[in-house]
Amino acid sequence: DIVITQDELSKPVTSGESVSISCRSSKSLLYKDGKTYLNWFLQGPQQSPRLLIYLMSTRASGVSDRFSGSGSGTDFTLEISRVKAEDVGVYYCQQLVEYPLTFGAGTKLELKR
């Protein structure tokens, strides 16, 4: 199985600042069609997970342009600019290159007081 690693379990950030959340894969997620099959999700408090980014860098419908995804075949970054209170929650990356589809353990974004 492909192992997805998110090293940072918690990421404290000040409102209004930018933050980067990282993720890496044990195998390249660049498929033969030239697309990179990595998703980013946000699970807010008492909410279901919501898709933010697919194909590594494409924002899902309705997602703010404050969110951007980038990376290579194995190393990925979700950048959030001008962090707001509504951005708090657990961010997960997911690979879709091969079954079983696997997720990282998640990175919890918390606002500093």
From Swiss-Prot:
Annotated S-S bridges: 23-93
Residues covered by region (Complementarity-determining-1): 24-39
Gene3D superfamilies with a match to the protein in the record: Immunoglobulins (2.60.40.10)
Region of interest called Complementarity-determining-3, as start-end residue ranges on this chain: 94-102
Other comments on record: This chain was isolated from a myeloma protein that binds phosphorylcholine.
Chain positions covered by the region annotation Framework-2: 40-54
Domain of life: Eukaryota
Species for this entry: Mus musculus (Mouse)
Region Framework-1, annotated ranges: 1-23
Keywords, ordered alphabetically: Adaptive immunity, Disulfide bond, Immunity, Immunoglobulin
One BP annotation, GO: adaptive immune response
Membrane-crossing segments per the record: none
Region (Framework-3): 62-93
Keyword Endoplasmic reticulum (UniProt): no
Name of the protein described by the UniProt record: Ig kappa chain V-II region MOPC 511
InterPro entries: Ig-like_dom (IPR007110), Ig-like_dom_sf (IPR036179), Ig-like_fold (IPR013783), Ig_sub (IPR003599), Ig_V-set (IPR013106), IgV_Light_Chain (IPR050150)
SMART domains tied to this protein: IG, IGv
Region (Complementarity-determining-2): 55-61
GO cellular component: immunoglobulin complex
Pfam family, one: V-set
Start and end residues of each stretch annotated as Framework-4: 103-112
